[in-house]
């Protein structure tokens, strides 16, 4: 069929060009050549063949690593699984963002899981961006393996941690939070004399000393002092620089920023947690998986790594109860409760 089309075009060309042989032959060759090439090209089948060969070679390579170098294979498989998880989450976040734009849905009106996914993905991608960029060129993922081996906690996000590393690193990060506890409690005690009401001063002093001596506070005791956190000296816009730096460490935010940026970041992050609390109350704590439950407790200040589901649910119910009772102007109390509600909870459940 194609060769017939080439002959037909040749006769038309001879008729139009006349008796000029050289021009006619050149035209015949140019017209025939594309028809000749198009009959033999099979790019799609070649690409699929190459892809299948590459997949087979990769599977053989993975089996070889698993047999000969099991420790390295663990790093390799962790990285590949983590990268796929990250790409899957990126697609899900893209769909959520697209729906927000098309339907005009603000962040605080999203369902809990979508809100939490956006919050966590934003923090993950900031930390993972350098590693992802490094891994794009061919064979550059071997450099990533070196980084995974020597600096997994500092450079990699949770997707690229092994289960053992995840547990170990969460403990390390929480110990970093605990180091800021004394400074935060001392800051609260130093603020007590500046409170105007005598009864409020007594309640605040009693609350702080109880926490310092190992007592876990009740929600009622915390709510009783909420007015102290709506204005000076403990309101969100009245905290001193040292207190804001200590609270930033508890929230895993860098403390090495000017005061106005520390205040802005603390305010935006605790507001984000309040929005998550509202969405979680609608969903219900019982609807969370164990992993979601432990993560929800951890970002609110509790080291939930070694706790049972029941203990996590008890603590999270207390947090949500207090959060639902507070006004927006009292957000500073919720921020301080990352210490007040978490410092002695483990000891209280052991007693």
Curated annotation (Swiss-Prot):
This is LETM1 domain-containing protein 1. Residues 152-351 are mitochondrial intermembrane. InterPro entries: LETM1-like_RBD, LETM1/MDM38-like. It comes from the Eukaryota. The keyword Transmembrane helix applies. The chain crosses the membrane at residues 131-151. Keywords: Membrane, Mitochondrion, Mitochondrion inner membrane, Mitochondrion outer membrane, Nucleus, Transmembrane, Transmembrane helix. GO terms for molecular function: ribosome binding. GO terms for biological process: mitochondrion organization. Residues 1-130 are cytoplasmic. It is found in: Mitochondrion outer membrane; Nucleus; Mitochondrion inner membrane. GO terms for cellular component: mitochondrial inner membrane; mitochondrial outer membrane; nucleus. Residues 172-351 form the Letm1 RBD domain. PANTHER family: LETM1 DOMAIN-CONTAINING PROTEIN 1, LEUCINE ZIPPER-EF-HAND CONTAINING TRANSMEMBRANE PROTEIN. The gene is letmd1. May play an essential role for mitochondrial structure and function. Pfam families: LETM1_RBD (PF07766). It is a single-pass membrane protein.
